């Protein structure tokens, strides 16, 4: 393995694609889970109390 510029070429792939449930570009293709709504991880929508307070 080499460090620096040659290894930066491996970072060009898309990590997140469009989610089937929420439609946002936050579905991790490798982990098969959505960061925004929790699709693939749980049946329920991902929501927390601090989200209401923060305006999400």
From Swiss-Prot:
Gene3D superfamilies xref list: 2.20.25.30
InterPro entries linked to this entry: Ribosomal_eL37, Ribosomal_eL37/eL43, Ribosomal_zn-bd
Keywords: Metal-binding, Ribonucleoprotein, Ribosomal protein, RNA-binding, rRNA-binding, Zinc, Zinc-finger
Gene Ontology MF terms in the entry: rRNA binding; structural constituent of ribosome; zinc ion binding
GO BP: translation
Cofactor: Zn(2+)
Superkingdom of the organism of origin: Archaea
Record text on cofactor binding: Binds 1 zinc ion per subunit.
GO annotations of cellular component type: cytosolic large ribosomal subunit
Zinc finger (C4-type): 19-37
A Pfam cross-reference name: Ribosomal_L37e
UniProt: Zn(2+) binding residues: 19, 22, 34, 37
Family membership: Belongs to the eukaryotic ribosomal protein eL37 family.
Known function: Binds to the 23S rRNA.
NCBIfam families to which the protein is assigned, alphabetical: PRK04179.1 (NF003214)
Protein name per UniProt: Large ribosomal subunit protein eL37
Organism per entry: Methanothrix thermoacetophila (strain DSM 6194 / JCM 14653 / NBRC 101360 / PT) (Methanosaeta thermophila)
Lineage, highest ranks first: Archaea, Methanobacteriati, Methanobacteriota, Stenosarchaea group, Methanomicrobia
Gene designation: rpl37e
